[in-house]
Amino acid sequence: MKKGIHPENYREVLFYDGSVQMGWIIRSCAATTKTMVWEDGKEYPFYPLDTSSASHPVYTGKRREVNTEGRASKFNERFKGMAGLAAKK
């Protein structure tokens, strides 16, 4: 192989989704300074994930409801007097 063209930090990295406490050890060049001891007792560079296939609603089939009631009631409260003005014109 040609020297000097391949990344030097290619190593096993623990990608961890904290919302479902699941992790995957994958060879990667992901830049991270954190480390974590995994189930096998070894210490790996640690890369935290916000969402993964284990927690994303598209993959899990579970729906998450967004709280829009507060936003809708704020909108209605703000513009409740406008309906009468529009009817008068």
From Swiss-Prot:
It holds the Pfam family Ribosomal_L31. The keyword Cell membrane does not apply. One of its GO terms (cellular component) is ribonucleoprotein complex. InterPro entries: Ribosomal_bL28/bL31-like_sf, Ribosomal_bL31, Ribosomal_bL31_B, Ribosomal_bL31_sf. PROSITE patterns: RIBOSOMAL_L31. The keyword Ribosomal protein applies. Gene3D superfamilies: Ribosomal protein L31. GO terms for biological process: translation. One of its GO terms (molecular function) is structural constituent of ribosome. Keywords: Ribonucleoprotein, Ribosomal protein. Part of the 50S ribosomal subunit. Belongs to the bacterial ribosomal protein bL31 family. Type B subfamily. NCBIfam families: L31, PRK01678.1. This is Large ribosomal subunit protein bL31B.
